[in-house]
């Protein structure tokens, strides 16, 4: 039993070293801009992906967010591992006021029906 506890502590300490400390507080419904490092040819650049957080899964180092945007009339969703070294930055542009943990119903909506009310607070808080 004691060996199991030590193994869990070792795993927790390794994960803590890998986690990013400077991430903003992200909630479902927020409008975010995620900077992703991508490699094209021999060059590396940061590509911005801006959209609404429709789901959050897992915790700790395995935390993921699903971000959805509509591009040229087609819905695009990407799942980001927020503590990944490929993620350069995450900015919260606007806080959304929602009453659900998962916003998958937005997939069925079109145009203005996909809008989410803004929270009264500022995005920095």
From Swiss-Prot:
GO molecular function annotations of the record: structural constituent of ribosome
InterPro entries: Ribosomal_bL19, Ribosomal_bL19_CS, Ribosomal_bL19_sf, Translation_prot_SH3-like_sf
Ribosomal protein listed as a keyword: yes
NCBIfam families, per database record: rplS_bact
Keyword check for Metal-binding: no
This protein's UniProt keywords: Ribonucleoprotein, Ribosomal protein
Domain of life: Bacteria
Name this polypeptide is given: Large ribosomal subunit protein bL19
Record's function text: This protein is located at the 30S-50S ribosomal subunit interface and may play a role in the structure and function of the aminoacyl-tRNA binding site.
Pfam families in the record: Ribosomal_L19
GO BP, sorted A to Z: translation
Species the sequence originates in: Synechococcus sp. (strain JA-2-3B'a(2-13)) (Cyanobacteria bacterium Yellowstone B-Prime)
GO cellular component, one term: cytosolic large ribosomal subunit
Family per record: Belongs to the bacterial ribosomal protein bL19 family.
